[in-house]
Amino acid sequence: MDIKDFRHHLHCHPELSFEEHQTAAFISERLSEMGVEHCPIAGTGILARIEGRRGNLERCVVLRADIDALPIKEMTGVDYASQSEGVMHACGHDCHAAMLYGVVKRLQMERDFEGTVLALFQPGEEQFPGGASLVLKENPFDKYKVAAVIGQHVDADMEVGEIGFCPGKFMASVDDLHFKIKGIGGYANVRSKVKDAVVAAADLILRLNMLNSDVCVVSVGNVEAKGTTNVIPERVTCDGTMRAFSEKLRQRVKDMITNIVEEIEYKHDVEVQLDVREGYPCVENDMQLTYEAMLLSDSLGYQTKDLEMRTTAEDFGYYTQLYPSLFYRLGVGRNVGRAHTATFLPDDKALEIGEEFMYRLALSILNK
């Protein structure tokens, strides 16, 4: 099976985060056909191992592709469109898995390298706590000297043939924020007997908005206050997100939010319950590894692009906290729709480029 057919099969049969049972079975079957040693990991993931013929097997490169889909009804109209109602590969994870499959296929056939390659088909990137965190809880890399963890992501802001890199800090951490504000409700015309949770919520949102900067984002996207035109509700809930570009800043912003909550309670004489649901850490690329990958991209004739830090988040950040890591972006065309929408359809022509670059990068790391 070639990588295009592999991608089309996954695209046709998408599965949500941590429900990738048929996806994992399909990947396992293809690996077994090639004689590639592999095992389940993190519930619905697959970890494959290919050993080089040159020895030094404890030295290792981990190649990672996520495999989960999104709860979106597909509207692309292609003949390999999703057959799973309301579920779609709208973030390119079908492409990621197909390219990694192609790399594994080539490595298994040739095996002319030093060390070991671990190919990780990872579940659950799209949903907290993130499949990466579950993978690491199983300690699958502990017996190896991990030289690098490599991941790539399709990018509709770049053309096919372009590969984008950002040395150092690349993607933000993400945490969900949930506020419950309790006051005393009552008639809107009797203000003296009311402790207004709506006003407190408005003040809270304005104060949170003041935390925004180039390195930190705090946003509230949902507010629920079940009052009426003349009735002030007792409770208001607010839900939002917090993103930061370092773990130190992440903790500092959490502390600042806690202080704001206390000030709102005192100022408005209400109770505010804050629940922070921790998400993914920052993605921070290894500097040397990134520069070497950029040189390789140039040498292979690709258009190497410099990327800026972005406030999107990725559970790949868990790997970057522990190992030298690189997460880069692969151009798939600018006219393919936007990620996380019903019409997103990366160009198949990008698959061979993504496979080739990841393959060459793995070999360059292991054989140097």
What are these regions (language model features)?
Residues 1-89, 98-101, 105-113:
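Acidic/His- and Gly-rich active-site-bordering loop/insert found
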Residues 1-14, 25, 35, 109, ...:
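N-terminal hydrophobic/helix-forming segments and targeting peptides
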Residues 10, 63, 93, 119, ...:
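Divalent metal-coordination and catalytic microenvironments
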Residues 13-18, 69-71, 127, 226-229, ...:
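Short, small-residue-enriched loops and turns at beta-alpha junctions
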Residues 62-64, 73, 177, 327-333:
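Non-cysteine beta-strand/loop elements that form the S-adenosyl-L-methionine
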Residues 70-72, 77-88, 94-95, 107, ...:
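Histidine/acidic-residue-rich, glycine-tolerant segments that coordinate divalent metal ions
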Residues 199-368:
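Metal-dependent amide/peptide-bond hydrolase catalytic core
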